Amino acid sequence: MASSPDSAPTYLEGVVTSSTGSWYDVRAEGRTIPSRIRGKFRLETEDVTNPIAVGDRVTIRLTEEDDTGFITKIHDRVNKLSRRAAGPRTGQEHILVANVDRIWSVQAVEFPAFNPRFLDRLLVAAAIHDIPAGLIINKVDLMTRDTAPRVMD
């Protein structure tokens, strides 16, 4: 599907579905295309640890050799969830996910125990970025009189 040496390069628009090191899986035209980021994106984004996140809409140029791609453009984000980077990159932003339609938190009543602190943090982050959020409570058959107040409050 890549272009021949005497033809124009093939460009596709897609969505990043996973990120592993310097490789990104981009879903475009019904298939997943392993793609790399161009070096200029890393140099232009010193304030973030990762210039591309899962959920980003991107344009890729297919390579002629092995049907992989090079990410040539990152489209504007509708929203994102991020946190401060840890370790030596403290002060930088680490983007967790981009272009989120909705956030669902699935929490068990027990095993593992319901975690209201995590839920609070998630709901606050969603509200800050105007992302609709919801809660799914799993393992309700394990709810007892002791666990009910912790979950229901």
List where the protein language model places each region.
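Conserved C-terminal guanine-recognition region of P-loop GTPase G domains, centered on the G4
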Residues: 90-153
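N-terminal accessory targeting/assembly segments
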Residues: 1-116
